[in-house]
Amino acid sequence: MLAAGISSMRAFLSAVVFSLALLPAASFAEQADGGVQVRKPKLMVVPESVVDRSAGQQYLQMKQQAASRGMLNRDAPQVARVRAIAERLIPQGRRFNAEAGNWAWEVNVIDSPAINAFCMPGGKIMVFRGLIEKLQLTDDELAAVIGHEIAHALLQHGRARMSEAVLKNVGVNLAALYFGLGDLGATALAQAAQLAITLPYSRSHETDADLAGIELAARAGYDPRAAVSLWRKMAAVGGGQPPQFLSTHPGHADRIREIEAGLPKVMPLYEKAAAR
C-alpha cells in the first residue's frame, strides 16, 4: 500500500514538473516604431499587487531611516537634477509597460557614498550620492543609470524574481520528496537550483534592462552612447569581479558589447528626440 502511494505521488510530481517545464519563461517584445527587443517574463505566480505593496513598504522604511539620519534629499540642486532626468524618462516607460502611467512614481536621493541606484516595482526610485559624485556622471550617463533601473521595474523583473523563488522552493521540496532525499537532498537541490535557475535569469534581466534603458534614454533625448562610458567608469572603480559564470550581472566587457550592439536601433530615436 505504501509503495503504491509513493508511486502515485511520484507520478503526480512528474506531471507537475512537466507542466511547469511547458510554461514559457518569457516572450520577446519590440516597439512598433523601432527600438530594442527585450524579453518580458511570463512565468508570474506572485500577484502584481503583492509585489507592489511589499516594494512600497520597503521603500517607505528606507526613506524613513534615511530621513531620521538626515540623509534624505540633503542636496537640493542634486535632487532637482535627478528628478528632472527621471521626469523625462518616466513617460517613455509606457511603451514597455502600459500600467506604468498609473504608478505612484517617487524619486529620492540618499546622501550615502555608496555607488548604487534602484527602482522598485511600482516606480520607487532611489539614487545614492556616491553614484553621482564618485563617477562624476554627466546628465546622459545619469539618464543611462536611471533608465536601466526604471527598465527593471517596467519589465517586472522584481516580480519575476519573486515568482522564481516561489517556484524554486516548491520545486525543491517536491524533488526532495520525489527522490526520497530528505533535508540533505533539499539543501543540495536548492544550491543547484540557485546556480541553474536564479543566476541565468538575473543576468538576462540585466541585459534586457540595459537595452530597454538605452531606449528610454534615447526617446527622452539623452545620448544612449553614454551607457558605454558609464559602464567603463563602473569597471574602473569596481576592481576585481567574481567569475562571470557565478555573477548575477554580466561582466563589464560583455555588458558594453551588448549595449553597443543595441545602439544602432536606438540612435535614430535619439536623433529624432534631439531634433524636437
Which residues are covered by each model-predicted region?
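Bacterial N-terminal signal peptides that target proteins for export
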Residues: L2-V16
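A Zn2+-metalloprotease active-site environment signal
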Residues: L2, S27-R276
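Intrinsic disorder/low-complexity segments in short proteins, especially the signal peptide
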Residues: S7, A25-S27
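Bacterial N-terminal signal peptides
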Residues: S14-P24
